[in-house]
Amino acid sequence: MASAGSLDVPERGHQRPFLIGVSGGTASGKSTVCEKIMELLGQNEVDHRQRKVVILSQDRFYKVLTPEQKTRALKGQYNFDHPDAFDNELMHRTLTQILEGQIVDVPMYDFITHSRLPETTTVYPADVLLFEGILAFYNQEIRDMFQLKLFVDTDSDVRLSRRVLRDMKRGRDLEQILTQYTTFVKPAFEEFSLPTKKYADVIIPRGVDNMVAINLIVQHIQDILNGDICKWQRGVLNGRSQKRTFPGQGESGGLILPGKRTHLESSSRPH
């Protein structure tokens, strides 16, 4: 997508943005986690042209469907959870432009008509980008762009109930939703999304309900915004370099370290 051009935007210097990938199954709470992070950082009330942290969804990069594909999509017979459904070339080009500090226009997608809209959203230079999507880690070229990778791990029954409620609000009937879930969504998650969990630096069970994990991530982003971008890379935060137990609700977690995965989950929740 072409750059939006030169606009009156505050200068941010030449430091490259810190890219954070957020993945997980459909309706796992990825966007909610990102929005909560924005809220805790006080960025949700900042003018979008001056935000230090921005969110971008992989959903913006669905391919333009052919007439035949759109007909199948309207019947719930098109697999939107398959890697081929995404325009990875446009996605990579957009992320590259963001890394270069450019102002970029990103597509908008209509989930009711299953079509890319002519309107675009402008993303202005920021210090941190949260990029969320079901297959954010699937493509290696894109995965390697993230300096921190988070995986939101939510029970399948919870994800299904959320998916049903969300899609019914989009005007779809229950039978079509369930058929699409069993035919495309669930198999695609197991084949394409779940295996990418191994690439995550941090695993967040229960999504936004896991405030221990959210607060830890917010603290790391705050360190980045304060200019100490290498703090987590050094593997030393106040002398803590190994996993530790967080107080409250039986949750445990660990420090984000290069090459080490942190699993922040409840020991009492069945999976």
From Swiss-Prot:
Residues reported to bind substrate: D81, Y109, H114, R163, R172, Q180
CDD domains, sorted: UMPK (cd02023)
Catalytic activity: uridine + ATP = UMP + ADP + H(+); cytidine + ATP = CMP + ADP + H(+)
Keyword RNA-binding assigned: no
GO MF term set: ATP binding; cytidine kinase activity; uridine kinase activity
EC number: 2.7.1.48
Compositional bias ranges of the Basic and acidic residues kind: 262-271
Residue ranges of the region described as Disordered: 241-271
GO cellular component terms, semicolon-separated: cytoplasm
Domain of life: Eukaryota
Pathway: Pyrimidine metabolism; CTP biosynthesis via salvage pathway; CTP from cytidine: step 1/3; Pyrimidine metabolism; UMP biosynthesis via salvage pathway; UMP from uridine: step 1/1
InterPro entries (alphabetical): P-loop_NTPase, PRK/URK, Uridine_kinase-like
Single Gene Ontology BP annotation: UMP salvage
Keywords: ATP-binding, Kinase, Nucleotide-binding, Transferase
Record: residues binding ATP: G24, G25, T26, A27, S28, G29, K30, S31, T32, D209
Pfam family, one: PRK
Family: Belongs to the uridine kinase family.
PANTHER family membership: URIDINE KINASE
Its biological purpose: Phosphorylates uridine and cytidine to uridine monophosphate and cytidine monophosphate. Does not phosphorylate deoxyribonucleosides or purine ribonucleosides. Can use ATP or GTP as a phosphate donor.
Name of the featured protein: Uridine-cytidine kinase 1-A
Annotated organism of origin: Xenopus laevis (African clawed frog)
